[in-house]
Amino acid sequence: MLDSLKQKKNFQRIKMRIKTGDLVKVINGKEKGKTGEVLKTIPLENRVVVKGINLRTKHVKPTQEGETGRILTEEASLHASNVMFFSKEKNLTSKIEYFIDKEGVKKRRLKKTGEVID
């Protein structure tokens, strides 16, 4: 999988500062303006899966005799550049920056407000 990604002409891995469990807002695409929690990050592909966003329907055929087919709805991935961290307290989106606090621990904070995330 990694080899196939490297073979793509303009493949560039971006630095993803979004982690699983973060609340994000979609800033581009058909789901623009919606917010949701990050379920999964795929750093090698620069993609994230967000709960309740970019839903796809999948038709599953019956695999055994007597079983009925069904329609599943699941979240598809979004490119990481199309989402931005969302702060519930301040009700705004912001970029994330890393910093080292007084104890020498690396933490994340919002660039706009300086609010420490973790």
Swiss-Prot record:
Keyword annotations: Ribonucleoprotein, Ribosomal protein, RNA-binding, rRNA-binding
UniProt GO molecular function: rRNA binding; structural constituent of ribosome
InterPro entries documented for this protein: KOW, Rib_uL2_dom2, Ribosomal_uL24, Ribosomal_uL24_CS, Ribosomal_uL24_KOW, Translation_prot_SH3-like_sf
Keyword Ubl conjugation assigned: no
GO cellular component: ribonucleoprotein complex; ribosome
SUPFAM superfamilies listed in its UniProt record: Translation proteins SH3-like domain (SSF50104)
Self-association and partners: Part of the 50S ribosomal subunit.
Family: Belongs to the universal ribosomal protein uL24 family.
NCBIfam families per record: rplX_bact
Its biological purpose: One of two assembly initiator proteins, it binds directly to the 5'-end of the 23S rRNA, where it nucleates assembly of the 50S subunit. One of the proteins that surrounds the polypeptide exit tunnel on the outside of the subunit.
Listed PANTHER family: MITOCHONDRIAL RIBOSOMAL PROTEIN L24 (PTHR12903)
Protein name: Large ribosomal subunit protein uL24
The organism of origin for this protein: Prochlorococcus marinus (strain MIT 9301)
Annotated gene: rplX
